[in-house]
């Protein structure tokens, strides 16, 4: 009996040992497979969906473009124009092998989840997964920290290739000044500015004896803050504690709305760098200060007089929230209301808009070399990245625009009935222009090999993009009529893709 018990016990131990060996061997094999393909288990959401119904732009037979997602908005007053010579609108139903997923990287974008869900796009919970597109300001950091995401394919789109450092107030102005030294007459869209510590000697010499002077006002701007935070009227050098700041000439000769200072928040989409494509959205916001403008010394420190940022003015008791697009007393307008304001002053809206487009193009060219260098250093394919930029522009009494700053990743959270359709349609138009592609769930892992896309492929992708519906976006560069005007600013900074792309456009 004892022998039998020992025998059974030994047999049990053997079975347990066998199972343990089998378990660890399985884990070992999975780890090998995962190291060969880190995305193998990165899309768990796909196991819970049998199908998606996707609305697609389907190219005609003679077009080399691929099918891409088509987004719609119920907040648009007019339908988006589709080039029926190139595309059909179709629906994929019950195609269980085709899926589209997205990853939401910031809480700020949560308001748009309902919009995306309406198009049956699946939300991924895995930041390191295989999503088609990634929304959020931290996407570029995801890539830098996780080399597996560097193995990009044509199905992935990441928000923000503009490193925020490139658009900081100090680096943006330095890029502008570098271009101004080379093209003095062309680069004149920013106010006179000095940067500490770079211009330490000049600042000490120029402002050593400066005292507050209503006829010679300057602003102190922290170099690395946004949203109007830390901006104040300059009084004297001894009052500045910051280690990095800008001293900027105060523009006091301003056009006013309802006797108040205002600026423009405009939206610009850069869909690629090689070749460079810049789109200017024809909808935007006019941000109006909450108290009347005055240079009276009594009000010189009043932020509600001198700053236009909505985040600053929204806490003022005088701030009027817009309830529709016709309330001219509100502190936020849309561009149509501003165009009406200009018309009443006998000012040509299109002429002012053309000057703003000129600023947008030149400012992006000024940082172009840094951006392409960032791409090369990180071995990033052009097709995988895009950036939505928020331009802040102020208008003088002579209706000359001046660039205040550029925001990479402007807020697309809506706060009222005026900006809700503007920002919703902005996202819809952005996604349509980007051309989000569907992937085959069964074959997706065969496409994960790291691949350097050729110049010819980049140009083909750019040409397909030009045929997509743009909604409120307008292509402002490159155009047949402005390539020759702007190409001189690429001197020593140009790319093979740009030159080939421009040639195609000019010969079209």
Question: Over which residues does each language-model region extend?
Answer:
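Glycine-rich phosphate-binding loop of ATP-grasp-fold ATP-dependent ligases
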Residues: 192-195, 215-240, 255, 264-265
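Hydrophobic residue at the +6 position relative to the catalytic HRD Asp in the kinase catalytic loop
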Residues: 391-393
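Short, acidic, Ser/Thr-enriched surface-loop or helix-capping motifs
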Residues: 396
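Acidic, PEST-like segments
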Residues: 37-150, 160-163, 167-182, 188-190, ...
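Short, low-complexity, Lys/Arg-enriched N-terminal segments of secretory-pathway carbohydrate enzymes
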Residues: 1-16
């Amino acid at each position: 009996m004892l022998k039998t018990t020992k025998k059974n016990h030994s047999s049990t131990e053997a079975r347990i040992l066998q199972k343990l060996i089998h378990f660890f061997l399985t884990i070992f094999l999975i780890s090998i497979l995962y190291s060969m393909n880190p995305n193998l288990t990165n899309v768990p959401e796909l196991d819970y969906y049998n199908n998606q119904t996707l609305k697609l732009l389907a190219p005609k037979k003679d077009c080399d473009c691929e099918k891409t997602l088509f987004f719609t908005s119920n907040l648009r007053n007019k339908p988006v124009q589709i080039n029926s010579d190139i595309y059909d609108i179709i629906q994929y139903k019950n195609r269980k092998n085709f899926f589209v997923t997205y990853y939401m990287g910031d809480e700020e974008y949560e308001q748009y989840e309902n919009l995306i869900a309406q198009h049956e796009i699946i939300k991924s919970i895995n930041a390191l997964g295989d999503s088609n597109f990634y929304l959020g300001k931290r996407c570029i950091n995801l890539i830098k920290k996780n080399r597996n995401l560097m193995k990009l394919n044509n199905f992935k789109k990441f928000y923000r290739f503009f490193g925020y450092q490139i658009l900081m107030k100090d680096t943006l102005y330095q890029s502008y000044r570098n271009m101004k030294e080379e093209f003095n007459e062309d680069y004149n869209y920013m106010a006179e500015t000095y940067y500490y510590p770079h211009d330490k000697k000049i600042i000490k010499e120029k402002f050593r004896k400066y005292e507050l002077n209503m006829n010679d006002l300057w602003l102190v701007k922290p170099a690395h803050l946004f949203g109007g935070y830390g901006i104040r009227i300059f009084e004297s050098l001894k009052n500045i504690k910051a280690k990095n700041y800008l001293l900027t000439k105060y523009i006091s000769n301003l056009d006013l709305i309802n006797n108040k200072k205002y600026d423009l928040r405009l939206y610009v989409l850069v869909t690629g760098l090689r070749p460079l494509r810049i789109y200017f959205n024809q909808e935007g916001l006019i941000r109006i200060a909450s108290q009347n403008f005055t240079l009276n010394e009594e009000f010189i420190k009043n932020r509600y007089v001198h700053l236009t940022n909505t985040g600053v003015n929204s806490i003022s008791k005088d701030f009027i929230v817009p309830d529709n697009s016709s309330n001219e007393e509100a502190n936020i307008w849309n561009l149509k209301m501003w165009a009406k304001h200009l018309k009443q002053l006998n000012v040509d809206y299109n002429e002012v808009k053309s000057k703003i487009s000129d600023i947008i193009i030149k400012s992006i060219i000024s940082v172009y070399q840094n951006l392409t260098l960032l791409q090369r250093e990180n071995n990033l394919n052009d097709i995988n990245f895009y950036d939505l930029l928020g331009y802040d522009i102020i208008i003088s009494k002579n209706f000359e625009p001046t660039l205040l700053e550029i925001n990479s990743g402007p807020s697309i959270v809506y706060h009222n009935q005026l900006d809700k359709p503007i920002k919703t349609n902005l996202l819809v138009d952005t996604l349509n222009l980007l051309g989000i592609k569907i992937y085959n769930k069964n074959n997706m892992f065969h496409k994960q090999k790291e691949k350097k896309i050729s110049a010819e492929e980049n140009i083909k992708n750019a040409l397909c993009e030009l045929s997509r519906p743009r909604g409120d976006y307008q292509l402002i560069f490159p155009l047949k009529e402005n390539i020759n005007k702007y190409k001189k600013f690429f001197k020593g900074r140009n790319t093979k893709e740009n030159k080939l792309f421009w040639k195609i456009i000019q010969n079209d």
